[in-house]
Amino acid sequence: MEIILIKPVRKLGKIGDILKVANGFGRNYLLPQKLAIRATKSNKELIVKQKHEFEAKDKQIRAEVEKINTLIKDQQLVFIRQTSDDCKLFGSVTNKDIADKLSKNISYNISHSNVILDKQIKSTGIYTVEIRLHAELTAIVTVIVARSDSEAQDYLREQKTENSADLAESE
């Protein structure tokens, strides 16, 4: 299937790119998510005319996303959860939990699909989580999962001492 991207797609292309993709990928993902349109003759002509408008719109979106990135950068999200004796959570911390808490902290709606987790968080500790705000821009957030506020503070102190030790080594 031949498509034209109308939004940038990570690891695929930028606005206005004409690509051949698998039929299922185009029909089931790119077209319904309004990331692309079919590459018909009329659409190709239309895209050539509107490419500058799309690029200007993308720059505007990117500038807005960079502002959000500065708000997100260096955020530390603390989750207090019940655990078993061996620090395993009863349940897990999911990308939706992280998106909800982050949205509340920065007063901007972050979708759970923007939160990139390799797997759900199922034990206490400190985790780094990637937030994909734009096809080319990601932010890193620290997630702390603990049994109590005091344990979360201990994790924070431990992380600060590790960071200061890393800085001393690099100098």
Curated annotation (Swiss-Prot):
Organism from which the protein derives: Rickettsia typhi (strain ATCC VR-144 / Wilmington)
SUPFAM superfamilies membership: L9 N-domain-like, Ribosomal protein L9 C-domain
Keywords from the UniProt entry: Ribonucleoprotein, Ribosomal protein, RNA-binding, rRNA-binding
Coiled coil region boundaries: none
GO molecular function, one term: rRNA binding
GO cellular component, as recorded: ribonucleoprotein complex; ribosome
Family statement: Belongs to the bacterial ribosomal protein bL9 family.
Name of the molecule in the record: Large ribosomal subunit protein bL9
Task of the protein: Binds to the 23S rRNA.
UniProt cross-references to InterPro entries, sorted A to Z: Ribosomal_bL9, Ribosomal_bL9/RNase_H1_N, Ribosomal_bL9_bac/chp, Ribosomal_bL9_C, Ribosomal_bL9_C_sf, Ribosomal_bL9_N, Ribosomal_bL9_N_sf
The keyword rRNA-binding is annotated on this UniProt entry: yes
Recorded name of the encoding gene: rplI
One of the protein's GO biological processes: translation
